[in-house]
């Protein structure tokens, strides 16, 4: 019985390793043609300035190329997380600075979609973390909020220190999450049959959760259908200057 169990475990391990390697190889192979397609599409856009119908098609193709590029990048990140090849380089970082970097990243989208991104938190709170990966985790939550929030609505990013723990909350007053989905949203590639978002690929939230857990934290979600959602990141290692 023990030998059978060991064989089963070994076989499962090999299968997972094969899938990781395959995903990583495919993702790397896609990067070069994607870069070329983006260049070609840029040339087409410049050549169709006086052809509005064709110009619109090049803009749409650019959006789809961007979507594929995000998928490839997220697949690579997930694969690296699974393989344990990511080295978290923690330093003391100012939380407000990180959140303002995120605000700048989404400023154009907020203006284009007529949505408001609001920041709320003390300027002197710090966190022992990997700056790049923590920004990635919060940015994915903010992107998710934008994807599920209509024009005229708002997304709020709030951070606060509670004892030696930092809590970051990304809250929106968008469509909310259906009760059937609430326990599945952190599963990879999960797509809700109730969601109006047809562009999402189902990797952003699982990636954020994995990054937070690598930092020794946890992530929770609260949502009311039709009223909005709040994603909460809780991490130890916070101090106030």
Summary of predicted features, one role per range:
Residues 89-92, 111, 116-126:
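Conserved catalytic submotifs in the C-terminal HATPase_c
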Residues 145-146:
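Short helix-loop "hinge" at the ATP-lid/N-box region of the Bergerat-fold HATPase_c
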Residues 63-71:
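Short alpha-helical segment of the dimerization/phosphotransfer core of two-component systems
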Residues 152-164:
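Short beta-strand/loop element within the Bergerat-fold HATPase_c
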Residues 172:
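Acidic ATP/Mg2+-coordinating residue in the GHKL
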């Amino acid at each position: 019985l023990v030998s059978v169990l060991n064989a089963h475990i070994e076989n499962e391990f090999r299968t997972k390793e094969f899938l990781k390697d395959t995903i990583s190889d495919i993702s790397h192979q896609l990067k070069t043609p994607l870069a070329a397609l983006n260049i070609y599409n840029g040339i087409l856009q410049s050549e169709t300035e006086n052809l509005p119908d064709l110009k619109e098609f090049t803009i749409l193709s650019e959006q789809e190329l961007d979507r594929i590029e995000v998928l490839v990048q997220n697949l690579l990140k997930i694969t690296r997380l699974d393989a344990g090849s990511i080295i978290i380089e923690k330093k003391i970082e100012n939380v407000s600075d990180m959140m303002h970097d995120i605000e700048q990243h989404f400023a154009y989208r907020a203006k284009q979609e007529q949505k408001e991104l609001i920041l709320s938190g003390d300027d002197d709170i710090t966190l022992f973390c990997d700056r790049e990966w923590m920004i990635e985790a919060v940015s994915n939550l903010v992107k998710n909020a934008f994807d599920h929030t209509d024009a005229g609505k708002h997304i709020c990013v709030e951070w606060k220190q509670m004892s030696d723990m930092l809590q970051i909350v990304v809250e929106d007053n968008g469509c909310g999450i259906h009760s059937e989905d609430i326990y599945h949203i952190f599963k990879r590639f999960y797509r809700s049959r109730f969601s109006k978002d047809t562009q999402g690929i189902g990797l952003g939230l699982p990636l954020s959760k994995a990054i937070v857990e690598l930092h020794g934290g946890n992530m929770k979600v609260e949502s009311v259908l039709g009223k909005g959602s709040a994603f909460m990141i809780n991490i130890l290692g916070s101090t106030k200057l």
